């Protein structure tokens, strides 16, 4: 397996698809990187030369925010929203949907699975 930016890329897939295994790189960015380096996007990952892998690493490190850096920036943005007490920040704190979805019945994805509470048992009559 080829290792780029701490991620093992599958060797039997096309490089265009393999690059999308890196957090922060989608299909369009992968195509953009390969066109910039003039690498055929239909080539398999195992067929890449070492020089090409080094070039891909350099471009990813210099030009893009990926993996841990991107996750850190996203979490800092969410924390900032919470500290300024914006509407979105409060919704994050409560674990509710942010973008105006209804919460009366369907918000299970955001709120998680149902947590049923056991009912109080009545004291036995004398």
Swiss-Prot record:
GO biological process: translation
Record organism: Gracilaria tenuistipitata var. liui
Span list, region Disordered: 95-126
Gene3D superfamilies reported for this sequence: 1.10.8.50, 30s ribosomal protein s13, domain 2
Subunit-level organization: Part of the 30S ribosomal subunit.
Protein name: Small ribosomal subunit protein uS13c
Keyword Plastid: yes
Subcellular location: Plastid, Chloroplast
Coiled coil residues, start to end: none
Task performed by this protein: Located at the top of the head of the 30S subunit, it contacts several helices of the 16S rRNA.
UniProt keyword list: Chloroplast, Plastid, Ribonucleoprotein, Ribosomal protein, RNA-binding, rRNA-binding
Transmembrane segments: none
Composition bias, Basic residues: 107-126
Disulfide pattern: none
Entry's family note: Belongs to the universal ribosomal protein uS13 family.
GO molecular function per UniProt: rRNA binding; structural constituent of ribosome
GO CC entries: chloroplast; cytosol; small ribosomal subunit
